[in-house]
């Protein structure tokens, strides 16, 4: 007999295996490994808890009461289901928050600039305040996400749980009480906390001003760049990890192909933005190095003059009284060498930054490096580098990253566009093959046009999706539920099915097939074997019967009507005859028609297994009322009865009047009478016993 632990593991395995349909083979390998490791750790912890606390036992339904160690995490509030709609929507929002954070962090590198007036390094105060505020807003949203992660159950809820994500109703279950410990022990909490540490803010507002006051202008750039990369690179991994986890959990991110293309373009734009910001900061460092060399060659110049008197500049004008600073600000030699665009100083790849480091336009300082990043990542070259090792390494990293990013961008967009246009291309290829075949077989123009119209109508209805094949590949229970959901409302529109119970309707929905007919299509000819029953959903059909002397009896079938009722008589007749019954009418579409088809074998199955349903008097009356054969017979019978009545009245009136030509008059009346009786006798009357034997 299976133990309690084995039963719990088996039930958990069945729940986990039911979610495989959400995953893809390429994206979920690492996530599945992580989930397996997490589940193993949880099982080990549960075994330890069982050994330590033997009081833990099963409650009703095989669920356990939570221990005191787990109850402290219940104080966080309502436990959230990771697959609930609210959590999935928040994951999408948080993905955009991560992208915003990746765009905001490089803005810290633009806060350093060179004063064109005093030729000193400073921090743009207003830009620093703006970037700090934006970073604080994204950090608050990250903190909110950490709080949500504490409340999300690390184990999926039971299938009968609440759809709103509340898995903590009716007492703590074994799967729902384990919430926060795996999130903490898997280092997810510490990693989420690391990416929101205020390292750039501390460096910008504390470290950099102190370094500027000491005159370490080149060290300032190095400290800011190292701090930025130290947190930015893990932040990129954090965003990618969240993206893949979200895709693994729900199977898609935003549900459309264009969102996938947009995410790839955003990632490429953010990469260009980060590369341009680093390029700008290294350009500031090259300018500071040039100014430092000029200061060392100038008599009376102190390195502290390379940093402004106020390290954080807010745009206020301050009177400079220091003569040494005034002399340095008026040094035209240093200005022409370091800050002039036509300088002979070897800036290398940072040549274009000369016009930016001393610019007062913040928009230009941000947009131009983004343009440089997009251009460099897209062209893989056009960089004039010096022999300095740091510049060479930077150029190598930028070019290699650009090659990888462009390759990934083109590949992903190609995949997304192929997913969008593959069906259309398959349709065009199929139409070319059909045109070639029709031309080879010399089909008439009318046939060709009918084939084209049918293919267009089928494409317009389903956009190339083979619904029958798609549903047939699903498990039997899921297939029946889906077809019952899709077809029930339409099947109930057929009056014949309105008085049947749900079991019969479920079997009918499981066997009906969706059919589309173009205008002017002959569906069935009179005298052919009836292959299926047709239930009109949209459009109109013309049902015609050929009487004697070339006379036709026609009626129109609209939504709610059906044809092929001969199959009902054939299935319920005793003894049963294997030969299919002949059709009593010809069906022609008057417009594009959508209908449900129930094949003869399916009708036979339904009538044999649910014979009691057709004994119902309401079903009998509905079948007779909506049957084209019964309607035609009833119309002819009423019409002939009326004509006989009118003929009787005519004969009665003629008995009081002397006719001028009594013989010819009587002869014509006799012919009419015989013609009427011949019509009623030769009209196809349905077998009255067909529905009495049900």
From Swiss-Prot:
Parts of the chain on the Extracellular side: 114-126, 209-216, 273-392
Q: Does the keyword Ligase apply?
A: no
- Listed as disulfide-bonded, the cysteine pairs are none
Residue intervals passing through the bilayer: 93-113, 127-147, 188-208, 217-237, 252-272, 393-413
- SUPFAM superfamilies the UniProt entry points to: cAMP-binding domain-like (SSF51206), Voltage-gated potassium channels (SSF81324)
Induction, as annotated: Induced by both ethylene and methyl jasmonate treatments, or after pathogen attack.
Annotated region described as Calmodulin-binding, given as residue ranges: 610-626
> Which Pfam family, any one of them, does this sequence belong to?
Ion_trans
The segment(s) forming the IQ domain are 631-660
Please describe what happens when the gene is knocked out.
Loss-of-function mutation results in the loss of the hypersensitive response leading to broad spectrum disease resistance, and displays a lesion-mimic phenotype.
* GO terms, molecular function: calmodulin binding; cAMP binding; cGMP binding; monoatomic cation transmembrane transporter activity; monoatomic ion channel activity
Q: Which ranges make up the Cytoplasmic topological domains here?
A: 1-92, 148-187, 238-251, 414-694
Topology in membrane: Multi-pass membrane protein
Q: What does this protein do?
A: Acts as a cyclic nucleotide-gated ion channel. Permeable to potassium and sodium in a cyclic nucleotide-dependent fashion (cAMP or cGMP). Might constitute a common downstream component of the signaling pathways leading to hypersensitive response (HR).
Please give the record's comment on domains.
The binding of calmodulin to the C-terminus might interfere with cyclic nucleotide binding and thus channel activation.
What name is this protein filed under?
Cyclic nucleotide-gated ion channel 4
This chain's source organism reads Arabidopsis thaliana (Mouse-ear cress)
Provide the gene name from the record: CNGC4
């Amino acid at each position: 007999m299976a133990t309690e632990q084995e039963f719990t593991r088996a039930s958990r395995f069945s729940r986990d295996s039911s979610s495989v349909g959400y995953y893809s083979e390429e994206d979920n390998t690492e996530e599945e490994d992580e989930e397996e490791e997490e589940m193993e750790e949880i099982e080990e912890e549960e075994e330890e808890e069982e050994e330590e606390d033997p009081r833990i036992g099963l409650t009703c339904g095989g669920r356990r009461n939570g221990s005191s160690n787990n109850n402290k995490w219940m104080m966080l509030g309502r436990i959230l289901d990771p697959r609930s709609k609210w959590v999935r929507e928040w994951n999408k929002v948080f993905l955009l928050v991560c992208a915003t954070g990746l765009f905001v962090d490089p803005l810290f590198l633009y806060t350093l600039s060179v004063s064109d007036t005093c030729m000193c390094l400073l921090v743009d105060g207003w830009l620093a305040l703006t970037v700090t505020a934006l970073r604080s807003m994204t950090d608050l949203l990250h903190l909110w996400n950490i709080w949500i992660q504490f409340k999300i159950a690390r184990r999926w809820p039971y299938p009968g749980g609440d759809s709103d994500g509340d898995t903590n109703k009716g007492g703590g279950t074994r799967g729902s009480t384990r919430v926060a410990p795996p999130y903490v022990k898997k280092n997810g909490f510490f990693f989420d906390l690391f990416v929101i540490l205020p390292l750039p803010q501390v460096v910008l507002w504390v470290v950099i001003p102190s370094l500027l006051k000491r005159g370490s202008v080149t060290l300032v750039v190095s400290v800011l760049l190292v701090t930025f990369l130290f947190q930015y690179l893990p932040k990129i991994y954090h965003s990618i990890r969240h993206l893949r986890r979200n895709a693994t959990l729900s199977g898609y991110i935003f549900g459309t192909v264009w969102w996938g293309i947009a995410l790839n373009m955003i990632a490429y734009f953010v990469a260009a933005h980060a590369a341009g910001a680093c390029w700008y900061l290294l350009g500031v460092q090259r300018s500071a190095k040039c100014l430092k060399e000029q200061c060392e060659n100038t008599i009376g110049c102190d390195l502290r003059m390379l940093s402004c008197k106020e390290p954080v500049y807010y745009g206020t004008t301050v009177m400079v009284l220091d003569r040494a600073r005034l002399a340095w600000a008026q040094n035209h030699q240093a200005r022409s060498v370091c800050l002039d665009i036509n300088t002979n100083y070897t800036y290398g790849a940072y040549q274009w930054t000369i016009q930016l480091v001393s610019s007062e336009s913040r928009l230009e300082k941000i947009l131009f490096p983004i343009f440089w990043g997009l251009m460099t990542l897209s062209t893989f070259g056009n960089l004039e580098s010096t022999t300095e090792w740091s510049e060479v390494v930077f150029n190598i990293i930028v070019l290699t990253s650009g090659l990888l990013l462009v390759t990934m961008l083109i590949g992903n967009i190609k995949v997304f566009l192929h997913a969008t246009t593959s069906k259309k291309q398959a349709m065009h290829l199929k139409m070319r093959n059909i045109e070639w075949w029709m031309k080879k077989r010399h089909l008439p123009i009318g046939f060709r046009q009918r084939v084209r119209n049918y293919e267009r109508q089928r494409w317009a209805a389903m956009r190339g999706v083979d619904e029958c094949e798609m549903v047939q590949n699903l498990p039997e229970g899921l297939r029946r539920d889906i077809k019952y959901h899709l077809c029930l409302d339409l099947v109930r529109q057929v009056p014949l099915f309105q008085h049947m119970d749900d079991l019969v309707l479920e079997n009918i929905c499981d066997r009906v097939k969706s059919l589309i007919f173009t205008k002017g299509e002959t569906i069935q000819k009179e005298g052919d074997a009836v292959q299926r029953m047709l239930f009109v959903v949209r459009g109109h059909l013309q049902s015609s019967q050929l009487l004697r002397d070339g006379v036709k009896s026609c009626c129109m079938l609209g939504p709610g009507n059906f044809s092929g009722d001969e199959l009902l008589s054939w299935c319920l007749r005793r003894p049963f005859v294997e030969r299919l019954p002949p059709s009593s009418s010809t069906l022609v579409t008057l417009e594009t028609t959508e209908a449900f088809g129930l094949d003869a074998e399916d009708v036979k199955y339904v009538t044999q297994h649910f014979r009691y349903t057709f004994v119902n008097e309401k079903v009998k009356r509905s079948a007779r009322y909506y049957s084209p054969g019964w309607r035609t017979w009833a119309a002819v019978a009423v019409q002939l009865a009326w004509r006989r009545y009118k003929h009787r009245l005519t004969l009665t009136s003629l008995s009081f009047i002397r006719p001028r030509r009594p013989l010819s008059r009587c002869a014509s009346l006799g012919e009419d009478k015989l013609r009427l009786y011949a019509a009623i006798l030769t009209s196809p009357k349905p077998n009255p016993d067909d529905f009495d034997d049900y």
